[in-house]
Amino acid sequence: MTTLRRAIALLLVTTSCGGEATDSAGGGGGNVGFGGAQDIGQFRAILDAGGIPGETTLDANGFFAEHYSESPPADCGQPLCVVARMAVGRDWVGGQDQAVVQLSLTTPVDPATVERRPLNLVVVIDTSGSMLEDDRIGYVRQGLHRLIDELEDGDRLALVTYANGVTEWSGLEEPIDRGTLHEVADQLAADGGTNIYDGLERGFQIATGAFDLERQNRVLLMSDGIPTAGNTDEGAILGMAEQYVSDGVGLTTIGVGLDFNVDLMRGLAERGAGSFYFLESPQAIAEVFGEELDYAMEPLALDVAVEVAADPRWHLGEVIGTRYWNGSGTEGGVTLPAVFVASRTSDQPGEYGRRGAGGALFVSMAPISGNPWKATGPVADVALSYRLPGSSEIITQRVAVASQASSEASDPWLSAESMAEHYAMYSMYLGLREATRQAEWSYQCAAAALDQLDRKADTWNQDAADEDIDADRALIARFRANLTALGAAPVGGDYAASCLGGGDGGTGDDVVYRDGPYACSAAGNGGGWWILALVALVYLRRRRP
C-alpha cells in the first residue's frame, strides 16, 4: 500500500499550486467531521501567494479536519457513540459571551485494523491546455506509470481524460493489462477546454456498468479549472452526479490552482459520499491519497442521524461544521449517509500530515433570557441513530447536555476537560472567519481582528502546547503580513474597539484593495452513500495511543 500511495502522489504532483498521549482500555473515541472538505489548502495557498482569502475559502469542515482534538472513550457499548459537551466563554476576537454545544461521534475501531476491499476505481483527469503549465501532463504520465505498476492484482483501474471532448483509455477489466495502460500513459497530451460534465458522466457510466458490492466503486475527479466546454451549468453537473451516486458509486474530487471552482468540486464530493481536497503542495498530494485509499472508502455506519432538542429555556443558533443542518430555534438535526474511521490519531502531524483528523459539529446555544453564565441546568437532549453495513437494524442512543457555568467560573467553563481542544479550535475558526469578513471592507480592521486572535491564541497555547494551534498562528502571521503589504497600518485604541465590535471602522483612503480578497470563483458545497438526503463524508477519530 505504501508504494501505491507513492505512485498516486507522483501521478498528481504537478497538479498542485505552487498534548501528551493518554491510555484508554478497550479502544478510544473521537470527533466527527461533517461535510466533504478535508483541508483548507486553497485558503493557505492564497496566503502563500500574497493574497487575501475570502470567507468562502475557509471551509469549517476542512479547518476542523486539520485539527486533532481528544475525545472520551467510546464507552456506549456500540460501534458508534455520540458524545455531547458544552463550553461557555467569550469570543476570542469580539469578547462577546457565547455558549456552544459540540457533538462528536466516537468509535472503538482502530484505524490500523481497517482493510480496504479491491478497487473499482475510475480516474477522470483534466487534460485541458492549462495542464501544460509546469509540465503537469509530464508528471501525470510518470505517475500513471508508477500507479499501474503498484496496483494490487485484485484492483481494477479505468482511465478517462477530458478537454473539449472525452477519451476513454481503459475500462474496469481484470486482470489489469499493465502493458496497454503503460502505452496509454505515454500518449497523454494536454490541449483545449475543460468539459467536466462529459468527462465525469463517462467516468460514472464506466463505474456503474461494472458495479460490484464486493468492491470499492468510486470515481476520482481531478480538475485545475472551471467548466469551459460542453455543459457548463453547475446545477446540471451536480444533478447528473446525484443520479449516478444514487446507484451506489462514490465520488472524490481534487481541486488544483487558485482559480478553480471550489464550490462545484466540493459540492460534487459531498453529493458522492466522498471527500473534497485542495492540493497546494506535493506533500499534500501524498497526504490526500494515502488517506483516501486507506481509510475513506470503508463505512463504519450508514444512514446516521443526529438530532438536537433544546430545553425550553434555550434556543439553537448558528451550526458550524455541516452545511446540511435542518431545524428551527428549538430543534434540528443532520442526516449523514455514511461515517468512516479517520486516519490521524494524535495532535502530531503523521503520515497524512494535518489532514485526516476528522472534524466537529458546533451548535451555538443562547438562553431565552439572561446570559449563558447564569442559565444553569438542562440545555439540550441529543439523539443518535444509525445502522451497520449489511444490516437493517436501527441502533439508537440518547445523551443529555447540561450547564453548570456561573459568573465566577473561569473563562471558558467546560463541561469536560476533553472539550478544551475543541473549544480552542472553534475559537480559532471563528476568529479567522471574522478576519476574512473584515477584509471585505477594511484591511485595517482585518489586521486588528488577527492581532486580537493571535494574542488570545498565544495565551491559550502557553499551557495547551497544541501544535495545531501553532500551525494556525503561522497562518495568522502570514495573513497579517499580506494585509500589511497591502496597506493595513497598525490599529489600536478606539478604532480597534470599533472594528472588533462590528462598528463602521475605517474604510476610505487608508484601505488598499488592489484585486480585493480572493474568494471562490463560483458557489456551492454538497454526498450520498446509497441515500442522498444530506450528504457528507464523516471521519471518526480515535484517542491518542
Name each region found by the language model.
Residues 2-10, 527-532:
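Sec-dependent signal peptide recognition
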Residues 13-16, 519:
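C-terminal motif of bacterial Sec signal peptides marking the signal peptidase cleavage site
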Residues 17-150, 158, 167-169, 173-215, 258-261, ...:
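Von Willebrand factor
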Residues 78, 212, 235-247, 256-389:
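Acidic, polar loop-rich interaction surfaces within structured domains
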Residues 125-128, 140, 159-162, 203, ...:
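DG-centered beta-turn motif at the end of beta-strands
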Residues 518-530:
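Juxtamembrane/start-of-transmembrane alpha-helix segments at the extracytoplasmic/lumenal side
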Residues 528-543:
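A cross-kingdom C-terminal cell-surface attachment/processing module
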